[in-house]
Amino acid sequence: MVRAGGWAPQDEVLGETGCGTLRRQMKQHLAVSAIGNDRTGMVHDLTRVISDCGGSISESRMATLGNEFAMLVLVSGNWHSLAKLESELARLGESTGLTLHMKRTEPRAPRTELLPYSIDVVCLDQAGIVAGLSGFCASRGIDIAEVSTRCYPAAHTGAQMFAVQMIINVPKRLQLAHLREEFMDYCDAQNLDAILEPVKS
């Protein structure tokens, strides 16, 4: 039976359940952090669970930190896949001792008002290097997208060195020539060898 206006009773049912079905089929995202004692097979354990649940790794960062191994992973999948993954990862944490945190999220929208730049810094190891660089960026409204650091002995002297790599997003409102000059002045004052250049696409 069709009611006035061409509306049928089943349309209401299809509308309600259809929206729910559509939401479950749409790609969703889960951010996962995991840390545990470094051992062979950790990456396989985590990625196998993601794959078995129907998830797909969109982005990831993994590193050894002391005797620990840390992983940051952005997983995409439909509602059912991610709901299953949340349960399976909780089981994995209990069985392996991994400390896991999970949070539903959305991919970041394109930010056309920002220009990606890379920072490379090398210096003698000393306290406060990252704090100083991040403070320089924060005071100018510059977003830090990625940070990577490491310590290593200098090849000839054996002196302990410190290296920093950053990806920053510079607002287009800033004058790049002036920013570069300020940055180099800051690094000279701190005895940092530094490079600031656009990210090559």
Q: What is the predicted role of each segment?
A:
Residues L22-S201:
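A conserved regulatory-domain signal marking ACT and ACT-like small-molecule sensing domains
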Residues D11-Q25:
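Short, Lys/Arg-enriched N-terminal segments with co-localized hydrophobic residues
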